[in-house]
Amino acid sequence: MNSSETQIPESRAARRRKNRILREQRRRRRLAYITGLVCALFVVVLTVLSALTPDKTFSANENRNLKQRPSISADGLLSGSFFGDTATHFSDQFALRDRWISLKLTYDKLIGMKESHDVYLGKDHYLLQKTVEPDEKALDDIANAVNSFASLHSDLSTRMLVVPCAAAVLPDKLPGSAPVRNQAADIDAFGQKLSGVAFTNASEALKSSNDSRNLYYRTDHHWTSYGARTVYEKCAPGLGIDAPVTEFDEYLLSETFLGTLGSQSGSFRRRDTIEIYVPKNCPNYYVYYADQGKTVSSLYVRDKLNEKDQYQVFLGGNHPIVEIHTAASTGKSLLIFKDSYANSFVQYLIPHYDTIIMIDPRYYFNRLDNVIQANGITDILFLYSANTLLADHSLAVCLNASA
């Protein structure tokens, strides 16, 4: 017999190895089939649930409107917009959507992700807004406008207070190796552009605080009432306040505050507390909202605690102009140009001025001379968060309109 035709008997060991391989292949095929079937059923069940569940119009956690079911039209089909709108609708209205978002965020943290939707996932449950890159052209425009305004009103005491964001003050809360600008230096660089303006950088006042209370909210980009109080107490001389109040009545307003960074990042579980500090023996006052034609007796709008953005408890949010008239009898009246950081700071200024006018240049488009004359303004304060000021385009427009 030809040796090439001779068959070598298969050994028992070889047959066992072959059988093990075949069994493993069958096991993997069954597992893949079961996994695929479970995933398919899971998707089908969630799709059916999503289809049967009425559409939500608003996501309180994300603080935004949700995509509604698109209507079918020839134009939409031909342009392809219908299919894109359908995909967005399905994503927005997916069953148990908030839980999936939270689960995804938990997974991201476990695998070492440092941020979610441009929000740093910090230590001790801090969510931190990134420091902005200064817009040098905008800053030159702002500095020129502020300098011109101060020169035009040289008879008034003009000051500016700039507050850094949490990432610049609490570097120990940042995730490892997270890049962050030296915002204190950015603030100082802007201050050097000013003339005729008493400038205060709040960075050191906040960094030097050794109190255990939070200076910033963990889920929001604003400072807390205590952070604002810290700057008020430490920076009072630079703000023209010779004798700051040192005793306050503290009140807890909320333990369920989910801020903008919680909404933006998808971190919905943790909640912040909102406290206020009312100066003892605070003079009587009233607040007038010109855009609403409404007068009230408190800075705090408690109805806002029932809404998503509970930070609006301070003055009800942002308005073009707010008037505060007090019984302080100091002979001084203050005009504040501001962003929303001032909303929780103004509570400390009540004892020091007879009148406080707050203008938000993002929404105010009238002339300023009439405001200054009608209210006997003696002092000007520009109060901004650094992340707003260093990329702002509205303040210069507002000031130049009245030049």
Walk through the language-model features, giving the residues of each.
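Extracellular glycan-modifying ectodomains
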Residues: 1-403
